[in-house]
């Protein structure tokens, strides 16, 4: 059987054969107070359930569809909020970067820096992120086949960084729709020689409105999609939640209501424990 790589995020070992790690939080930093509220809730629930946890939020949504859409507080204010979250809750942080100049200042504060799906083939950005020495979460582009992720992992390795986590977030299926190929998780593992795979359930539920300026979504299907992904044996889940998804400033239609977080994660942990209790069956 293929050996599974372990990527350490501080004291958290992330691997496809380890108990699942949760990358989760809110889509974008809407305010300091809301970030504190959401992070505190995640920390309480994950501590109670014994789930390794990394808080996620964006400080700048640089790829919004409309020029009028909210982007976030920006780099300087965003890093201040992240540092306060770390100091207050002792939580690890993941956030995305969009330019080479952002890579090091962000890596100086957070624990994982994320390469956005739309930018995953940009070599200059890959090189800048690799040079920070940080753990990298690579969003697989919607236009890229699962087998092609090996090229991204190789590019980071050539730039001196092998601390790579891969994130599935769905593939384009015609116009304005995304689907998740459950066979793709195994292909990604093989193509990357056992890199940890995280499943971004929230963004896989996006469904664009061809006449609108923002994405729609199918949050009512969060549970079934997350269960299907975990059943393949992966390293973790990526989830966004909000106390009032209909009022969220980005991707509310795909966000999990915050009051559903504990029952949702309790089911996910039970399923992950069951799947990883099975002996491997090597079929050739």
From Swiss-Prot:
Broadest EC class assigned to this enzyme: transferase
Which Gene Ontology BP terms does the record give? keto-3-deoxy-D-manno-octulosonic acid biosynthetic process
Major location category of this protein:
cytoplasm
**EC number assigned by the record:** 2.5.1.55
Against InterPro entries, the record matches this protein to: Aldolase_TIM, DAHP1/KDSA, KDO8P_synthase
| Recorded catalytic activity of this chain's protein | D-arabinose 5-phosphate + phosphoenolpyruvate + H2O = 3-deoxy-alpha-D-manno-2-octulosonate-8-phosphate + phosphate
MF terms in GO = 3-deoxy-8-phosphooctulonate synthase activity
Short name of any one Pfam family annotated for the protein: DAHP_synth_1
Q: Which GO terms describe its cellular component?
A: cytoplasm
Where it sits in the cell: the answer is: Cytoplasm
Q: In which pathway does it act?
A: Carbohydrate biosynthesis; 3-deoxy-D-manno-octulosonate biosynthesis; 3-deoxy-D-manno-octulosonate from D-ribulose 5-phosphate: step 2/3; Bacterial outer membrane biogenesis; lipopolysaccharide biosynthesis
Q: Which UniProt keywords are listed?
A: Cytoplasm, Lipopolysaccharide biosynthesis, Transferase
The entry's family comment says: Belongs to the KdsA family.
The protein here is known as 2-dehydro-3-deoxyphosphooctonate aldolase
